[in-house]
């Protein structure tokens, strides 16, 4: 995909994008992983309205795996699942987990607390 984009996008645009990307990442230089992801969560760094975990956690992007996981659970007799990092549990909440004990964990304490409040009955 990247190679295809490089063929069509002018080099100066790619250079500008890279410069912008590096400047955004520079704010995390030298920080602990927990601090980086806490900042990303608190500032909603990914800018996705559907999931604070980013574009890769939307229902559209995860539809295929969400549809197939229940079959995997059943086929392999899976009784428990540990999901690290679980992020905001946005798409995983929609996966049928009949008979599977789900445990999610994340490095962002505020996110874990929020998930525990939102999903305490699940």
Regions found by a protein language model. Give the residues of each.
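Conserved N-terminal segment of class I S-adenosyl-L-methionine
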Residues: 2-122
């Amino acid at each position: 995909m990247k190679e295809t984009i490089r063929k069509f996008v002018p080099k100066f645009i790619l250079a500008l994008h890279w410069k912008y990307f590096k400047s955004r990442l520079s704010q995390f230089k030298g920080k602990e992983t927990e601090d980086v992801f806490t900042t990303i969560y608190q500032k909603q760094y990914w800018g996705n309205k559907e999931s604070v975990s980013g574009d890769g956690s939307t229902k559209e992007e995860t539809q295929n795996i969400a549809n197939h996981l229940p079959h995997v659970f059943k086929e392999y007799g899976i009784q428990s699942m540990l999901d690290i990092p679980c992020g905001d549990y946005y798409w995983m909440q929609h996966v049928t987990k009949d008979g599977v004990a789900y445990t999610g964990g994340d490095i962002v304490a505020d996110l874990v607390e929020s998930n525990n409040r939102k999903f305490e009955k699940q």
